[in-house]
Amino acid sequence: MKTRILTFATAAALLFTAHSAVALTKSTTFNVSSSVAANCTISATDLNFGAYDPLVANKTTALDVNTTVTVLCTKGSNGVTVGLDLGTHGAAANRFMSNGTDSLQYELYSNSAGGTVWSNGGAGLVTWPVFGPIGAGAGTPHTVFGRVPAGQDVSVGSYTDIITATVNF
């Protein structure tokens, strides 16, 4: 009889242990989301006309140079335009570099020197093309054509201006 009680107790203990080892599970779901807003970056390299010679080299020939403005936007950014202001010494619709006492006129163009003036509004805004690979660190460059007109009567000195390039998106 003692053996039967011990066997019964052992069986009961095993049954209880086996029952508690069976775990129940429940599941749920949750949403994952994010949003990507239109965003752009803009950079530009300096434009250096170099030496302007109003007596010989540039007496009848304009001084033409170019630089680049580069824009990188998130994929799907639409209606992106880039404008260039008149600079810190601009007046009316003209751009000028200054040496503090005298001014040297110049202009910036979007298609070629002497073509379409690149401005900050209207027809002078440049509509940016379809953008290349996103996230590759490279943007879409566009050439800025600069021209100092020939035959300007200006004083000796260093002439400078500061242009602000703005990306609208």
Regions found by a protein language model. Name each.
Residues M1-A9:
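Bacterial N-terminal signal peptides that target proteins for export
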Residues A12:
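Polar, enzyme-active/binding microenvironments
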Residues T17-S20:
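N-terminal signal peptide c-region/cleavage motif recognized by signal peptidases
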Residues V22-S98, W128-F169:
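N-terminal small/polar-rich segments of proteins
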Residues I42-S43, V117-T127:
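Short beta-strand and strand-turn-strand segments in soluble, beta-rich domains
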Residues D85-G87, E107-N111:
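Predominantly extracellular/luminal cell-surface or secreted proteins
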Residues R95-M97, T101-L108:
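Glycan-recognition/cleft segments
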Residues S112-G114, F169:
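Solvent-exposed strand-loop boundary residues in beta-sheet-rich modules
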